[in-house]
A protein has these predicted regions:
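N-terminal-proximal low-complexity accessory segments that begin disordered
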Residues: 1-49
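Structural beta-strand/beta-sheet cores of well-ordered domains, especially the beta-sheet scaffolds
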Residues: 18, 144-146, 179, 197-199, ...
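Buried hydrophobic positions in well-ordered alpha/beta secondary-structure cores of metabolic enzymes
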Residues: 23-24, 183-185, 262
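Conserved structured core elements
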Residues: 30, 129, 133, 193, ...
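Internal helix-loop-helix
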Residues: 48-146, 198
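Glycine-rich, mobile lid/loop segments that gate access to catalytic sites or pores
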Residues: 114-182, 186-193, 198, 209-211
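A short core secondary-structure module
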Residues: 186, 190-241
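Glycine-rich beta->alpha junctions and the first turn(s) of the following alpha-helix
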Residues: 243-311
Length: 311
């Protein structure tokens, strides 16, 4: 499949069956909701710019998995130059949207999970790396947006996951089957989950042997059965409903966060990238954090360019 256009991206999200709740009610049409639409427009820009010849060197790359042209947000970095182009792409998008364009966490998760799964397989002879490569090739082929999910609700932060009074404050495996696992819990503050086709789950802290059920990484579609999104709000959100052009902030672009709840969600074996290998949880968090700190050096600078009139 060729790179999607922005309009094709919008329609692909419209065709999904996501369970979205806001202000205590189910949102039947998230794509056209006036509060939520600006965040979708921000992601659309990552597709629109990839179609323009003058930006393709930054916005696209050659896949190491397929040899095909892919959106850079789905690319596995192969060189220092890839990292330079990544941060330049992020600055460009910050200049174009003056907002969060929501795909950085997924891209950084891609690269962290790619290398960590290789390390796990080397030690345990598992097939996580092959699982992830197949998933990544699928994402690239269909030009999908992926949400990277790391932050758990956590509860008492002085205690490990297995010590929490409520065992679901960290996302965990509650059942193991011959064909996969069942997970329960939530991921918090998920910018862009609403506008993503897939979600990659990662552990949020280093873990010990007693936390085996919590050391889990996998990917599922955002509209998988049992996933619910509860939209968090910002102070001026409802001003977009008042019909005025005053004090609505960035009217065209924006970001929106969700609490993503997993109510006994099934994950097939070929979508599992870690399951119980607790000593690798910290490695995955650390590698992700390194990539994501670099991302902030691109997107925030681009938004800063807008704020000082230099975009």
């Amino acid at each position: 499949m060729a790179l999607m256009t922005g309009e094709q991206y919008i329609e692909s999200i419209r065709n999904m069956k996501m369970q979205v709740y806001m202000f205590g009610k189910k949102v039947e049409n998230p794509v056209d909701d006036p509060i939520l639409r600006p965040s979708l427009n921000s992601v659309r820009m990552t597709y629109d710019l990839a179609q323009k010849p003058e930006y393709q060197d930054l916005m696209t790359a050659t896949s190491n998995l397929t040899g095909q042209q892919v959106n850079r947000f789905t690319h596995i970095h192969q060189s220092a130059q890839d990292l330079v182009k990544k941060v330049k792409m992020q600055r460009l998008l910050g200049q174009q949207t003056a907002a969060c364009f929501q795909r950085c966490v997924g891209m950084d998760a891609f690269n962290a999970v790619y290398s960590t799964t290789y390390e796990i397989d080397q030690k345990y002879g598992t097939s996580y790396h092959e699982n992830f490569k197949k998933f990544a090739a699928y994402v690239q082929e269909h030009d999908l947006t992926v949400d990277g999910a790391m932050t758990d609700p956590k509860g008492d932060r002085s205690k490990a996951p297995h010590e929490q009074e409520d065992p679901d404050l960290f996302l965990r495996v509650v059942e193991r089957r011959p064909d996969g696992i069942v997970v329960r819990g939530a991921k918090a503050h998920q910018t862009g989950a609403l506008n993503s086709h897939e979600i990659i789950i990662m552990p949020t802290i280093s873990m010990g042997p007693e936390d085996k059920d919590y050391a889990v990484s996998f990917a599922v579609p955002m509209d998988a059965e049992g996933i619910f999104m509860i939209i968090g709000r910002q102070s001026c959100d409802t001003r977009k409903l008042e019909g005025s052009e005053l004090d609505v902030g960035n009217a065209e672009f924006g970001g929106v966060e969700a609490l993503v709840v997993f109510d006994d969600v099934f994950v097939p074996n070929d979508r599992i990238f870690m399951c119980g290998e607790t000593e690798f949880a910290g490695m995955l968090v650390e590698r992700f954090a390194g990539y994501h700190r670099q991302s902030y050096g691109g997107c925030k600078v681009g938004v800063g360019d807008v704020l000082i009139g230099a975009a």
